[in-house]
C-alpha cells in the first residue's frame, strides 16, 4: 500500500421529482417521529409502572428481611445466651464431676465430699472452683492424702495472699513444693528455686527447730532433710500466713471472686433444673437418628444428593463463565488486532497521558509565568511605544491634535462644534432627564453612570432654555477636519489616557504603584498558601504559634498589599530611596532587596515565635540589601508602566507520525513547548516501556 494513492467516488442518483420525493421523505420521517414519540411515551409509562412495582417489592422484601433478620438474631442471641450462661456452665460442672469420680476410682462418696469442700473453698478464696479442682487433682497425683491436700491448698492460698501471688505464680510455687514432697528430700536446688517465690526453706526450718541456719543449710547440702523436715516446713509456712486469704476476701478482688462463684452455682442450678437434660435428650435423638440412617443407608443417599447439587452448581458456574467468555472474546480479539496492526494500545494510552500532561503543564506554567512576564516586559514595551511615537511624530502623520495649552471650548469651536442646551432629554437616560437613572456609589455619594458633558452640535444652533444637560455630539458628515501633527499615541482601552497625558514622572509613579500592587497580591497569596499548608501538616501542628504568625503575614499582608498598592511598611522604607533622583540604580535595588529580605526573613523566623520574627526580619533585611545588585533589573521592570501587558506567546508543537506498511502503526508522539522549556517526548528513550 505504501506509495499508492487510493480514490473513492460516491455517486448519488436522484430519479423523479426531487421536491416531491423530499416532501414524501419528510412526511415519513415526521410520521416515524410521532410514532416513536408515542412508543417511547408508552414505554416510559410502563417503565415507571414497573419501577414503582419493583420499589414496592423491594420495600416489602427489605421489611420482610429485616423481620427475619431480627428474628434470626433474636434466636441466635437467645441460643448464645443460654449456651454461654447456663448450658456451658452445666457442661463444665458435669465434666468436673466426672473427673473427680475418676480421681477416686468411682468412689462417689469421697468424690462428693471433696467436691463440696472445693465449692466452699472457692467461695472463701480468690482461686475459683476451677483453680481449686486443678490443684486437688495435681496434689493427689503427687501422693498426698485428702487431709494433706486440703492443708496444702489452704497453706498455699494464704502464702499467695501474703506475697501477692496470682494464680499462675501460686501454681508455680505449688509445683516446686509438691516435687520436693514427692522426692521426700529438700535439696539446695529446691531451696534456691523457692527463694524466687519469697519462701526461705532453710530459715523456716531454723525458726521451727531453733537451729542455726548455717547448720540447716549444711544438712540440706548433704541431703539429710527428709519428709519430716518437709512437713515441718509446710506447717511453719501455714502458721506464718494463717488468715491472709480470709483478709484478702474483704478486698474488691475477693468480693468479686465470691460473687462470681455464687453466680456460677446459680447458673448450674438453673441448667440442672431441666433445660440441660432436655437439650441432652434432643442431642441423643439426633445421635440415634444418625446411627439409624447410617445403618440403613439413608445417610449415604443424603450425602450423595447434596454432593450432586454442589456438583451441578459448579458445572453451571463453569458453563456460564465459558458462555460469557464466548461473548467477550470477539471484543478481546478486536482490541488485540488493533493493538498489533493499527496502534499499540499501550502507546495510545501513553500518548493521551502525555498530551494531557502537556496541556496541564502549559496551563500551570503560564499561570505562574504570566505575572513575571508582565513585569519583565514593561520596560521593553514602554521603550518600543515611545520610539514609535517619536517616529510617527517625525514623519508628520495626521491625527486628531491634543494641544498643550488649549481649552476644550477653543478646541471644539475650532472644529465646528458649539454648545447648546437641551430641555427634553428622555427621562431616566443616564441621569440626564428628570427621571434620573441608575447610579453608582462612589466615595460616599451616588454618581451618575454617564458624566455631565456639554451638549454640542455642529453648525449654528439657537440657544434653548438655560438648563444645561450637556452631552458631546460630533459634527455631521461633510464637515472638514484640519489635519495636525501626530499627537501622543492614544490607547485602545480606557484608563491609559490618564497615564500617557501626564509627565514622565507621573508615568513612573503610576507604573511603580501598579507593579507594587501586583507584587503585593502575588506575595500575599504565596505567604497565605504557605501558611495554610504548614497549618494542616504535622509541622504546623507542632509549631502552632509560628504557623499562626505566618498565616497572619500571608493573609494580612495580602489584603494590605492588594488594597493599598504595596505594604505600608514597605512603602515607607522604599519611598525615600526610590523618589531620590540622585540615588543610583544599585542603591534603589538595595532598598528593594532589603525590604523583600525583611518580609521573607520575618516569615521564616515566625516559626520560632515573635522573637524569631524580629530576628528573621533583621537578618533578611541585611542579606537583601547586599543582594541589591541582583534585583536591579527587577526595580527597572517595576518602574515601567503599561495597562495592556502583551500576552506571552507559547510555541507548542504536537506531532503524530503514522507509518504505513503491512498495517497502520503509531511509532511516536511528541509534545514540545519552546516558550516554557517544556519538552515531552513519547519515545523509547523517555517513557519506560515504549
Swiss-Prot record:
<dbReference type="GO" id="GO:0030430">
    <property type="term" value="C:host cell cytoplasm"/>
</dbReference>
<protein>
    <recommendedName>
        <fullName>Probable tape measure protein</fullName>
    </recommendedName>
</protein>
<dbReference type="Pfam" id="PF20155">
    <property type="entry name" value="TMP_3"/>
</dbReference>
<dbReference type="GO" id="GO:0098003">
    <property type="term" value="P:viral tail assembly"/>
</dbReference>
<dbReference type="InterPro" id="IPR013491">
    <property type="entry name" value="Tape_meas_N"/>
</dbReference>
<dbReference type="InterPro" id="IPR053058">
    <property type="entry name" value="Mulikevirus_tape_measure"/>
</dbReference>
<keyword id="KW-1245">Viral tail assembly</keyword>
<comment type="function">
    <text>Serves as a base for tail tube protein polymerization and acts as a template for tail length determination. Might remain in the tube and be ejected from the tail prior to the DNA during DNA ejection (Potential).</text>
</comment>
<keyword id="KW-0426">Late protein</keyword>
<comment type="similarity">
    <text>Belongs to the Mulikevirus tape measure protein family.</text>
</comment>
<keyword id="KW-1188">Viral release from host cell</keyword>
<keyword id="KW-1035">Host cytoplasm</keyword>
Amino acid at each position: 500500500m505504501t506509495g499508492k494513492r487510493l480514490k473513492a467516488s460516491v455517486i448519488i442518483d436522484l430519479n423523479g421529482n426531487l421536491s416531491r420525493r423530499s416532501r414524501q421523505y419528510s412526511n415519513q420521517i415526521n410520521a416515524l417521529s410521532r410514532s416513536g414519540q408515542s412508543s417511547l411515551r408508552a414505554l416510559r409509562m410502563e417503565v415507571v409502572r414497573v419501577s414503582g412495582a419493583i420499589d414496592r417489592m423491594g420495600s416489602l422484601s427489605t421489611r420482610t428481611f429485616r423481620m427475619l433478620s431480627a428474628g434470626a438474631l433474636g434466636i441466635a442471641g437467645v441460643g448464645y445466651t443460654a449456651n454461654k450462661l447456663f448450658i456451658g456452665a452445666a457442661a463444665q460442672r458435669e465434666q468436673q464431676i466426672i473427673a473427680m469420680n475418676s480421681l477416686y476410682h468411682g468412689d462417689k462418696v469421697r468424690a462428693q465430699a471433696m467436691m463440696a469442700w472445693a465449692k466452699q473453698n472457692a467461695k472463701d478464696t480468690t482461686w475459683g472452683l476451677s483453680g481449686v479442682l486443678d490443684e486437688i487433682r495435681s496434689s493427689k497425683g503427687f501422693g498426698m492424702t485428702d487431709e494433706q491436700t486440703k492443708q496444702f491448698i489452704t497453706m498455699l492460698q494464704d502464702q499467695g495472699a501474703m506475697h501477692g501471688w496470682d494464680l499462675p505464680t501460686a501454681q508455680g510455687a505449688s509445683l516446686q513444693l509438691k516435687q520436693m514432697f514427692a522426692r521426700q528430700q529438700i535439696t539446695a536446688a529446691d531451696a534456691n528455686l523457692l527463694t524466687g517465690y519469697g519462701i526461705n526453706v532453710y530459715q523456716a526450718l531454723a525458726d521451727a527447730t531453733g537451729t542455726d541456719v548455717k547448720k540447716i543449710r549444711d544438712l540440706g547440702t548433704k541431703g539429710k532433710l527428709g519428709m519430716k523436715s518437709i512437713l515441718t516446713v509446710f506447717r511453719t509456712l501455714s502458721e506464718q500466713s494463717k488468715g491472709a486469704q480470709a483478709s484478702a476476701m474483704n478486698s474488691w478482688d475477693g468480693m468479686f471472686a465470691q460473687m462470681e462463684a455464687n453466680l456460677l452455682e446459680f447458673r448450674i442450678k438453673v441448667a440442672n433444673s431441666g433445660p440441660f437434660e432436655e437439650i441432652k435428650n434432643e442431642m441423643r435423638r439426633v445421635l440415634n437418628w444418625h446411627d439409624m440412617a447410617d445403618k440403613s443407608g439413608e445417610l449415604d443417599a443424603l450425602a450423595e444428593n447434596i454432593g450432586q447439587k454442589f456438583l451441578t452448581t459448579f458445572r453451571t458456574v463453569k458453563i456460564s463463565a465459558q458462555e460469557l467468555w464466548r461473548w467477550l472474546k470477539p471484543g478481546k480479539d478486536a482490541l488485540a488486532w488493533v493493538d498489533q496492526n493499527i496502534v499499540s494500545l499501550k502507546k495510545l494510552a501513553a500518548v493521551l497521558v502525555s498530551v494531557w500532561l502537556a496541556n496541564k503543564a502549559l496551563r500551570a506554567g503560564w499561570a505562574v509565568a504570566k505575572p513575571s512576564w508582565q513585569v519583565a516586559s514593561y520596560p521593553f514595551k514602554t521603550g518600543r511605544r515611545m520610539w514609535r511615537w517619536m517616529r510617527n511624530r517625525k514623519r508628520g502623520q495626521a491625527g486628531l491634535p491634543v494641544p498643550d495649552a488649549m481649552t476644550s471650548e477653543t478646541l471644539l469651536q475650532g472644529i465646528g462644534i458649539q454648545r447648546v442646551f437641551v430641555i427634553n432629554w428622555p427621562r431616566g437616560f443616564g441621569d440626564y432627564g428628570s427621571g434620573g437613572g441608575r447610579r453608582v456609589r462612589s466615595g460616599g455619594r451616588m454618581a451618575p453612570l454617564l458624566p455631565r458633558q456639554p451638549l454640542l452640535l455642529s453648525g449654528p444652533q439657537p440657544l434653548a432654555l438655560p438648563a444645561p444637560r450637556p452631552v458631546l455630539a460630533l459634527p455631521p458628515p461633510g464637515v472638514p477636519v484640519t489635519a495636525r501633527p501626530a499627537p501622543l499615541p492614544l490607547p485602545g482601552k480606557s484608563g491609559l489616557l490618564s497615564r500617557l497625558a501626564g509627565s514622565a514622572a507621573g508615568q513612573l509613579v503610576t507604573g511603580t504603584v501598579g507593579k507594587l500592587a501586583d507584587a503585593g497580591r502575588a506575595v500575599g497569596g504565596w505567604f497565605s498558601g504557605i501558611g495554610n499548608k504548614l497549618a494542616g501538616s504535622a509541622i504546623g501542628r507542632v509549631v502552632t504559634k509560628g504557623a499562626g504568625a505566618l498565616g497572619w503575614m500571608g493573609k494580612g499582608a495580602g489584603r494590605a498589599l492588594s488594597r493599598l498598592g504595596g505594604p505600608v511598611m514597605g512603602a515607607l522604607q522604599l519611598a525615600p530611596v526610590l523618589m531620590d533622583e540622585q540615588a543610583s540604580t544599585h542603591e534603589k535595588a538595595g532598598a528593594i532587596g532589603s525590604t523583600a529580605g525583611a518580609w521573607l526573613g520575618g516569615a521564616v523566623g515566625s516559626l520560632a515565635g515573635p522573637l524569631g520574627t524580629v530576628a528573621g526580619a533583621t537578618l533578611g533585611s541585611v542579606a537583601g540589601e547586599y543582594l541589591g545588585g541582583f534585583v536591579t533589573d527587577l526595580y527597572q521592570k517595576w518602574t515601567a508602566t503599561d495597562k495592556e501587558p502583551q500576552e506571552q506567546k507559547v510555541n507548542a508543537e504536537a506531532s503524530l507520525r503514522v507509518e504505513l506498511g503491512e498495517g497502520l502503526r503509531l511509532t511516536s508522539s511528541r509534545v514540545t513547548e519552546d516558550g516554557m522549556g517544556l519538552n515531552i517526548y513519547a519515545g523509547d528513550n523517555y517513557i519506560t516501556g515504549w
